[in-house]
């Protein structure tokens, strides 16, 4: 379990799960709006933002929380946060660019950053796995 209550809006922490980095990002309203405004059919790995977040204890989608495995889907490098032209993630190894929803936008990566299985155990705690 991880406490996410202290992560400020617009910030991110990295935790380890099964030896992998997990990015836990507290998205701003602007980041959410940007992710929702994308024409999903134009994406290499089409997936709406709502499919990349889950409902919290109250049953509402917790759109402010993006939780992804921090491993590029190209060759396994660790992307840099808040980088690239979409303010999401940038992989320094081969130039893949992900948006604020962790979706691949440019570069050689074939898939979006993976969303691990997780659940909210309270308003401020998540359990991964």
Q: Which sequence ranges carry the predicted segments?
A:
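C-terminal segment of N-terminal export signals and the immediately downstream linker at the start
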Residues: 1-20
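Short, surface-exposed charged micro-motifs
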Residues: 14, 23, 117
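Structured loops at beta-to-helix junctions and adjacent beta-edge loops in soluble globular domains
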Residues: 18, 25-27, 70
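Short hydrophobic-aromatic micro-motifs
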Residues: 22-25, 128
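Residue-level structural signal for beta-strand termini and adjacent loop
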Residues: 27-28, 110
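Short, surface-exposed beta-strand-loop junctions and turns on beta-sheet-rich folds
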Residues: 30-32
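Rieske [2Fe-2S] iron-sulfur-binding domain
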Residues: 34-129
């Amino acid at each position: 379990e991880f406490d996410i209550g202290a992560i400020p809006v617009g910030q991110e922490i990295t935790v380890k799960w099964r030896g992998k980095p997990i990015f836990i990002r507290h998205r701003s309203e602007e980041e959410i709006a940007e992710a929702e405004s994308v024409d999903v059919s134009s994406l290499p790995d089409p997936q709406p933002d709502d499919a990349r977040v889950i409902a919290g204890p109250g049953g509402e989608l917790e759109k402010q929380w993006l939780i992804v495995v921090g491993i590029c889907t190209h060759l396994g490098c660790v992307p840099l946060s808040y980088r690239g032209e979409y303010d999401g993630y940038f992989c320094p190894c081969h130039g893949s660019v992900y948006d604020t929803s962790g979706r691949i936008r440019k570069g050689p990566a074939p898939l979006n950053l993976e969303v691990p299985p997780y659940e909210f155990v309270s308003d401020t705690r998540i359990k991964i796995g």
